[in-house]
């Protein structure tokens, strides 16, 4: 980003009442990413200073808001978004609607449940019937457009549960997950009418849960801190980790996961340290790494899938974009467009042809051992 652009964004932020200085506004290629979401071609990036809106087609930061240490963000448009701000022993939940921002918290009486009800607020999610959900320390909350309803669930043997993951299936079932102070997980189905959670016994109960989503077949996928990831079909869990037969990559030496998600082609992705891992359903392999010799401690913090792309948030080098078709990783920066258009998965030749293609989309008949290829829309590893 050039200096004039940065200065203009700074004054715009100050004019809107955000106390900020140039030094406090970190560009998209250097920021500490906490969460991401997408609207059209605009990527919304939550950081420890506020949030950025980056146009991925043009390759330009459209807006910067220095509103504090964000933990979570969701958006329907540039003028309709939610974010949570961590204040230490409390949080605020903020709704931007048009030119107005409404703040909800225990301090202003909007969030009920006592002094801890908004601590560590995160996991913002849109639910059925235009509801908004978030989790906190010992509580999770639902907004129906007018007011918040807070739900208190039983504490574990090690204290309150910090709820941070929500997922919704096609039947409207609410799946919730979190961890207590000793990183013991809870996972289960929640009935918002009765206000009751039905816990599901799982073998990751002694681990932390950090991500969760529901696929098109209503399977629930859960990412854990150190036991790999799980697929739950409503009755049975299947675990995938570094010791699974599906792991054919010697570089996957840990079962830690971050940011479990699913790409448009059906592949599952997660991260550990600086590596992005792809699980095709048959195999696990490192799809790429985020490396920068000037930032040896950099690590992937979150993932966000968008069409054929996986956006990768990091702790020190901002956002990177992985193209699931070409296998290329590009660091986002002003002046670097990364999304030209979202490909229709039904018209991409690599997804409809019996021919074999490499990850760059080139047709090939000479298959090399140890490489990944595409045929009929499915990636496979040539042993």
Task: List each model region and its residues.
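C-terminal tail/sorting-segment detector
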Residues: 2-3, 374-383
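Sec/Tat signal peptide C-region and signal peptidase I cleavage site
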Residues: 18-23
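Short coil-to-beta transitions that initiate beta-strands within beta-rich domains
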Residues: 24-39, 63-78, 105-128, 152-170, ...
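Conserved beta-propeller blade signature
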Residues: 42-45, 81-83, 131-133, 173-176, ...
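Residue-level signature of beta-propeller blades and closely related beta-rich strand-turn architectures
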Residues: 49, 87, 138, 180-181, ...
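Short loop/turn segments that connect beta-strands within beta-propeller blades
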Residues: 55-59, 96-100, 143-147, 190-195, ...
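Structural motif
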Residues: 89-94, 182-188, 228-230, 277, ...
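Residue-level detector of functionally pivotal "anchor" positions at catalytic/ligand-binding pockets or at interdomain
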Residues: 325-362
């Amino acid at each position: 980003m050039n200096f004039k652009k940065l200065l203009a964004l700074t004054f715009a932020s100050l004019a809107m009442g955000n106390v900020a200085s140039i030094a406090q506004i970190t560009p998209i290629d250097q920021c500490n990413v906490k969460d991401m979401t997408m609207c059209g071609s605009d990527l919304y990036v939550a950081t420890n200073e506020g949030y950025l809106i980056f146009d991925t087609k043009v390759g330009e930061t459209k807006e910067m808001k220095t509103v504090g240490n964000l933990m979570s963000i969701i958006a329907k448009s540039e003028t309709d978004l939610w974010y949570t701000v961590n204040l230490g022993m409390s949080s605020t939940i903020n709704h931007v609607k048009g030119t107005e921002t409404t703040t909800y918290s225990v301090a202003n009486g909007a969030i009920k449940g006592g002094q801890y009800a908004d601590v560590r607020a995160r996991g913002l999610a849109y639910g059925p019937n235009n509801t908004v959900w978030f989790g906190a320390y010992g509580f999770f909350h639902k907004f129906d457009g007018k007011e918040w309803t807070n739900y208190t669930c039983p504490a574990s043997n090690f204290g309150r549960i910090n709820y941070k993951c929500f997922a919704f299936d096609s039947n409207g079932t609410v799946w919730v997950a979190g961890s207590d102070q000793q990183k013991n997980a809870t996972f289960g189905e929640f009935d918002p009418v009765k206000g009751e959670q039905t816990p599901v016994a799982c073998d990751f109960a002694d681990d932390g849960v950090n991500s969760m989503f529901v696929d098109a077949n209503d399977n629930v996928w859960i990412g854990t801190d150190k036991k790999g990831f799980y697929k739950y079909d409503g009755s049975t869990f299947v675990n995938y980790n570094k010791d699974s037969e599906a792991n054919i990559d010697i570089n996957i030496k840990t079962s830690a996961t971050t940011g479990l998600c699913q790409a448009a082609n059906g592949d599952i992705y997660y991260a550990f340290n600086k590596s992005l891992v792809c699980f095709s359903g048959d195999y696990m392999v490192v799809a790429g790494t985020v490396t920068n010799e000037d930032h040896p401690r950099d690590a992937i913090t979150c993932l966000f899938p968008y069409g054929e792309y996986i956006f990768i948030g990091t702790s020190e080098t901002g956002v990177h974009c992985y193209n699931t078709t070409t296998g290329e990783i590009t660091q986002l920066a002003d002046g670097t467009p990364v999304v030209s258009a979202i490909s229709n998965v039904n018209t991409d030749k690599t997804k409809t042809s019996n021919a074999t293609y490499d990850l760059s989309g080139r047709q090939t008949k000479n298959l090399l051992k140890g490489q990944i290829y595409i045929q009929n829309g499915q990636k496979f590893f040539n042993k």
